[in-house]
């Protein structure tokens, strides 16, 4: 599933995100969503979330 639509993302699901420090390389990190930080319904680079381990990144793929 696509990580650009907020309606696809709910707390507790497993996702792949790109962290701020990994934006240049595109390295993806797997984690479980704790909070959704983006307020808009759509974001072209992915919805920003906080993972349960407190890392913040933009959702690239939903597992």
Question: For each predicted feature, which ranges?
Answer:
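Basic/aromatic-rich interaction segments and small domains that mediate binding to polyanionic partners
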Residues: 2-63
